[in-house]
C-alpha cells in the first residue's frame, strides 16, 4: 500500500479513537515520523503516564509497552507487533531476583527498565539509561544489585564508586557488537568527530567516548554542540532525529551492525492495524502490576 495512504489512514484512525502514538528512537524512520512523541524509555514512560489519551499505540518492544500499561492500567496499550521482544530483557527472571534476595538480603535491587514486568515487580526501583546514575547515587541503600545489563551497571559503578554494586551478567546483543577497535578505526577515519555512545556498550568502548548517554541525551548533546561531526555508538534509528534536527552536521555510525531487529519490526502497516483492530493489547497480571507499578513510580518520583 502507498505510504501516504497508510499515513492518512493512521492519522484518521488516531483521531477517531483519541489515540496517542509514541515511538522509541530506534524505530524505523516512517514510524518515528507519524508518532506524536519520539524519545527514550524514560521520556516515553513519563509521556504515557501524563497524557490524557485512553489508547496508546507504543511503537517499541514488549517491555516498553508493558511499562506503559503498568503506569497507566486503565488505558488500552497496543503493541503493533506482539513478537517485538528484547533479548536483554529475557536474560533475567523473577526467580533469579528471588534467589539474589536470598543470597544478598541486605542489598536493594535496582532494575533497568529493559526487563519483564515480573522482574520489575520484585525490584526496589527501576531506572533507565538516562537516570541510572542518579537513581543509584540517590537510593538510600549503599548496597545495590544492578540488573540485568552488566555494561550499563559497569558505567554506573564507575560513576558511583562509593556504593557496593553487584552486577548481573546480561547485555544488549546490538551494543555488544561494538569493540574498542571499531572506535579506534572510526576515530582515524573521522579525526574531527566526537564519539557519542550509549552506556549499554562495553566498558572499553565507553572509555574511549567523548560523551556517554541515553538516546535522548545523545540527540540533545549533538543538538547543542558547536562541533559538526559525530561518531554514533548506538542503534542507527537515532540517525533519523539527529539528521532531521541537525541538517548541517555529519553523523557516522560506529558499527554497520547497529540494527536492533526487534525494534525494526513495527511498520506503518502494523501501526495502522493496531489502531484499526485495537491489537495487540498488553495485559499485566494484577499481582505483578502492583509491585512493578511501585518500582516504576519510585523511579518517576526520584526523577
UniProtKB/Swiss-Prot annotation:
Q: Which InterPro entries match?
A: NadA, NadA_sf, Quinolinate_synth_type2
Q: Which reaction does it catalyse?
A: iminosuccinate + dihydroxyacetone phosphate = quinolinate + phosphate + 2 H2O + H(+)
**A GO molecular-function annotation:** 4 iron, 4 sulfur cluster binding
What Gene3D superfamilies does the record point to? NadA-like (3.40.50.10800)
Its required cofactor(s), as named, are: [4Fe-4S] cluster
Annotated Gene Ontology cellular components are: cytosol
Per the annotation, how and in what number is the cofactor bound?
Answer: Binds 1 [4Fe-4S] cluster per subunit.
Q: Which residues bind [4Fe-4S] cluster?
A: 86, 172, 260
- Entry EC no(s): 2.5.1.72
Q: What class of enzyme is it?
A: transferase
Instruction: Identify the keywords attached in UniProt to this record, alphabetized.
Output: 4Fe-4S, Cytoplasm, Iron, Iron-sulfur, Metal-binding, Pyridine nucleotide biosynthesis, Transferase
Which pathway is recorded for this entry?
Cofactor biosynthesis; NAD(+) biosynthesis; quinolinate from iminoaspartate: step 1/1
**Record-annotated residues binding iminosuccinate?**
24, 41, 112-114, 129, 198-200, 215
Q: Where in the cell is it found?
A: Cytoplasm
Q: What does this protein do?
A: Catalyzes the condensation of iminoaspartate with dihydroxyacetone phosphate to form quinolinate.
The UniProt entry's sequence similarity note says: Belongs to the quinolinate synthase family. Type 2 subfamily.
The record's section on NCBIfam families has:
nadA, PRK09375.1-2
- Name of protein: Quinolinate synthase
| Natural source organism | Caldicellulosiruptor bescii (strain ATCC BAA-1888 / DSM 6725 / KCTC 15123 / Z-1320)
Name of the gene this protein is made from:
nadA
